[in-house]
């Protein structure tokens, strides 16, 4: 329905907004570093 369409488009806007993009990048980097530490490798 209409409400669902609105929710989806709002979620898409939020998901691709700048603060969220930066946050996603930080989380990805943290995860990569964590895994690298666990397996004893340096992230590239």
UniProtKB/Swiss-Prot annotation:
Pfam families: Antimicrobial_7 (PF08102)
Subcellular location field: Secreted; Target cell membrane
InterPro entries: Antimicrobial_7
Tissue specificity of this protein: Expressed by the venom gland.
Keyword Transport (UniProt): yes
Gene Ontology cellular component list: extracellular region; membrane; other organism cell membrane
Recorded superkingdom: Eukaryota
Keywords in alphabetical order: Antibiotic, Antimicrobial, Ion transport, Membrane, Secreted, Target cell membrane, Target membrane, Transmembrane, Transport
Example GO biological process: defense response to bacterium
Keyword Secreted annotated: yes
Family: Belongs to the non-disulfide-bridged peptide (NDBP) superfamily. Long chain multifunctional peptide (group 2) family.
Function of the molecule: Disrupts cell membranes through formation of pores. Strong antimicrobial activity against Gram-positive bacteria B.subtilis, S.epidermidis, E.faecalis and S.aureus. Less active against Gram-negative bacteria P.aeruginosa and E.coli. Has no antifungal or hemolytic activity.
Name of the protein: Pandinin-1
Taxonomic lineage of the native organism: Eukaryota, Metazoa, Ecdysozoa, Arthropoda, Chelicerata
